[in-house]
């Protein structure tokens, strides 16, 4: 018998198609090294994903486009922060060179 049971899993998602997509995406994340949300009984990433879905630790985002936009904003913000940090470092190096030439 499949553990977790399909009936239990279908209580967590709107349809069996959503379940398959969610399981596949989470299994890929786990294979890529994403941190687990719990301890597992299973060895395979697909079964681990099902365990997380059953426990409620992994769910479908209610607004996927909103999530994508939030991720885009976070990436852009991180990029801006890195550019500002790089600019400050370059300014500091230029200032140190200028101070070194004065001596």
Curated annotation (Swiss-Prot):
Region of interest called Disordered, as start-end residue ranges on this chain: 52-103
EC number: 2.7.7.6
InterPro entries, per the entry: DNA-dir_RNA_pol_omega, Pol_omega/Rpo6/RPB6, RPB6/omega-like_sf
Biased composition (Basic and acidic residues): 62-103
GO MF annotations in UniProt: bacterial-type RNA polymerase core enzyme binding; DNA binding; DNA-directed RNA polymerase activity
GO biological process: DNA-templated transcription initiation
Coiled-coil blocks: none
Domain of life, source organism: Bacteria
Alphabetic keyword roster: DNA-directed RNA polymerase, Nucleotidyltransferase, Transcription, Transferase
GO cellular component, one term: cytosolic DNA-directed RNA polymerase complex
Catalytic activity: RNA(n) + a ribonucleoside 5'-triphosphate = RNA(n+1) + diphosphate
The protein's enzyme class: transferase
Cell cycle among keywords: no
Keyword Transcription part of the UniProt annotation: yes
Assembly mode: The RNAP catalytic core consists of 2 alpha, 1 beta, 1 beta' and 1 omega subunit. When a sigma factor is associated with the core the holoenzyme is formed, which can initiate transcription.
Family stated for the protein in its record: Belongs to the RNA polymerase subunit omega family.
Function as written in the Swiss-Prot or TrEMBL entry: Promotes RNA polymerase assembly. Latches the N- and C-terminal regions of the beta' subunit thereby facilitating its interaction with the beta and alpha subunits.
Descriptive protein name: DNA-directed RNA polymerase subunit omega
The encoding gene: rpoZ
């Amino acid at each position: 018998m499949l553990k977790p049971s399909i009936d239990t899993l279908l209580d967590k998602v709107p349809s069996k198609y959503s379940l398959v997509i969610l399981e596949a995406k989470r299994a890929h994340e786990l294979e890529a090294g994403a941190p687990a949300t719990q301890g597992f009984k299973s060895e395979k990433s697909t079964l681990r994903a099902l365990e997380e879905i059953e426990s409620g630790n992994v769910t479908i985002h209610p607004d996927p486009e909103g999530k994508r936009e939030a991720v885009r904003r976070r990436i852009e913000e991180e990029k801006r922060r890195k550019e500002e940090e790089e600019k400050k470092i370059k300014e500091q190096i230029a200032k140190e060179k200028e101070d070194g030439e004065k001596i």
